């Protein structure tokens, strides 16, 4: 870290890692504290493990340029692959791990995750400091008895027969080995896995671990996939891993720069896809310097605040709406356009100063016909009203305990939301003052 700060890096903070930097899956294994969210796709994909917070933050925050992590058996490459960003496992022993808590000293390596390969290369250069080739030239001059004690049979075989160093210092590596790590498959965070079994087999991701070679993740693009979480087509990243000969780390980073310059790779963006796009939920907060920053963090069961297009897409042509219990009217057949205009208005859910969270309790379903279903839900709707859209100062709170009927109809073969009827049981604090247009002044104070 001192090397980075010497080059002008500003350390922003620390990030979540899995317990003991071990291999864990979201929800199933993250027990003591919550796993970070992967912002890509439907926002409900596993962020991978160990350096999960580093990968999630780089894919989520535009103001964050670089994240440091460690890779023992894939702890940088895994988060990089599933979140479609650049990440590297350096040649083992190239970078000092003095004062770092070890997991496996013979396998541990530090590395970076980044969206911009130019910045990634500059950070790697700061970490390496000296030319890696000069380090290995020095190592090659040492007695073979010392080297043999630090190599395994696989390492010798691979580095001598599969991917040896080139005699040309400009090319460094005799070749490159490519393997696929991120293949755009859904790995949802709400799945529970089988009990652990003895390890079996050997994956391509383990080559660099045992051969001590550099292995880096290159995001190639993204592909569409239908999500069972959002019921929409989302986009998942596709990545490839590039392995070079031991000590040829700079070659890989320069290759990424050249591929961006040639238009083959891209500088990546934050969001639901590697080319951008809104994440399922947004939070506003203010840094110490007073600049407003929008962090986009995914959250289960929550649509993007003000993602009105997504809401419009699930509405039936007409809706039954009974808002009499929250100070509005009742409509037997409100058009979808009128419903959108009402809920998105500044005096209702479109108010940027209002934040709300709906917690659903017991639920039952009533099948009225082949084309109509009614959902009956217990509900606690919590609201906070702020003095301004920067959401710094709370003005008032108002919470409602209710049951809610939701209506669904099949329209042209597709199930659509067709209305609602909340039945308020009791309120907490100043619920009547949450929405500006819901109650008249006389009703608020009656």
From Swiss-Prot:
Family annotation (Pfam families): Amidase, Scytalone_dh
Keywords: Lyase
Enzyme Commission number: 4.2.1.-
Uppermost EC category: lyase
Domain of life: Eukaryota
SUPFAM superfamilies in UniProt: Amidase signature (AS) enzymes, NTF2-like
Binding site for substrate: 323, 404
InterPro entries: Amidase_dom, AS_sf, NTF2-like_dom_sf, Scytalone_dh
UniProt GO MF annotations: lyase activity
TM ranges: none
Active-site annotation: 358, 383
Quaternary structure (record): Homotrimer. Each subunit contains an active site, located in the central part of the hydrophobic core of the monomer, which functions independently.
Functional summary from the UniProt entry: Scytalone dehydratase-like protein; part of the Pks2 gene cluster that mediates the formation of infectious structures (appressoria), enabling these fungi to kill insects faster. The product of the Pks2 gene cluster is different from the one of Pks1 and has still not been identified.
Family label: Belongs to the scytalone dehydratase family.
Protein name: Scytalone dehydratase-like protein Arp1
Organism from which the protein derives: Metarhizium acridum (strain CQMa 102)
């Amino acid at each position: 870290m001192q090397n980075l700060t010497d080059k002008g890096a500003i350390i922003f903070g620390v990030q979540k890692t899995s317990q003991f930097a071990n291999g864990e899956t979201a929800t199933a294994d993250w027990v003591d504290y919550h796993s970070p969210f992967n912002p890509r796709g439907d926002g409900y994909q596993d962020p991978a493990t160990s350096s999960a917070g580093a990968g999630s933050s780089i894919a989520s925050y535009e103001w964050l340029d670089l994240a440091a992590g460690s890779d023992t058996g894939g702890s940088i490459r895994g988060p990089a692959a599933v979140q479609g960003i650049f990440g590297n496992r350096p040649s083992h022993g190239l970078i000092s791990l003095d004062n770092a808590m070890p997991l496996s000293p013979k396998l541990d390596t530090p590395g970076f995750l980044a969206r911009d390969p130019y910045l990634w290369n500059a950070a790697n250069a700061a970490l390496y400091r000296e030319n890696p080739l000069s380090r290995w030239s020095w190592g090659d001059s040492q007695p073979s008895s010392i080297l043999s004690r630090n190599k395994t049979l696989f390492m010798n075989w691979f580095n001598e027969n599969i991917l040896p160093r080139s005699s040309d210092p400009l090319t460094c590596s005799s070749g490159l080995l490519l393997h696929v790590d991120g293949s755009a498959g859904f790995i949802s965070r709400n799945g529970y896995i089988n009990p652990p079994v003895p390890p079996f087999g050997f994956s391509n991701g383990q080559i660099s671990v045992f051969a001590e070679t550099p292995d880096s993740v290159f995001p190639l693009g993204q592909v569409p996939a239908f999500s069972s979480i959002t019921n929409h087509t989302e986009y998942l990243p596709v990545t490839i891993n590039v392995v070079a000969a031991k000590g040829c780390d700079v070659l890989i980073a320069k290759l990424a720069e050249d591929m961006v310059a040639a238009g083959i790779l891209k500088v990546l963006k934050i969001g639901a896809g590697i080319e951008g796009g809104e994440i399922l939920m947004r939070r506003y907060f203010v840094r110490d310097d007073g600049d407003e920053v929008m962090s986009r963090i995914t959250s289960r069961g929550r649509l993007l605040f003000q993602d009105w297009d997504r809401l419009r897409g699930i509405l039936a042509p007409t809706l039954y709406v009974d808002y009499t219990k929250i100070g509005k009217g009742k409509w037997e057949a409100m058009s979808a356009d009128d419903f959108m205009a009402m809920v998105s208005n500044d005096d209702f859910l479109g108010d940027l100063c209002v934040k709300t969270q709906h917690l659903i309790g017991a639920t039952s379903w009533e099948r009225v016909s082949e084309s109509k279903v009614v959902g009956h839900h217990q509900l606690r709707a919590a609201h906070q009203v702020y003095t301004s859209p920067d959401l710094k100062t709370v003005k008032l709170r108002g919470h409602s305990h209710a049951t809610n009927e939701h209506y669904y109809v099949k329209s042209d073969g597709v199930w659509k939301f067709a209305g609602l009827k909340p039945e308020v049981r009791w309120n907490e604090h100043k619920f009547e003052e949450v929405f500006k247009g819901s109650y008249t002044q006389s009703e608020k104070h009656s």
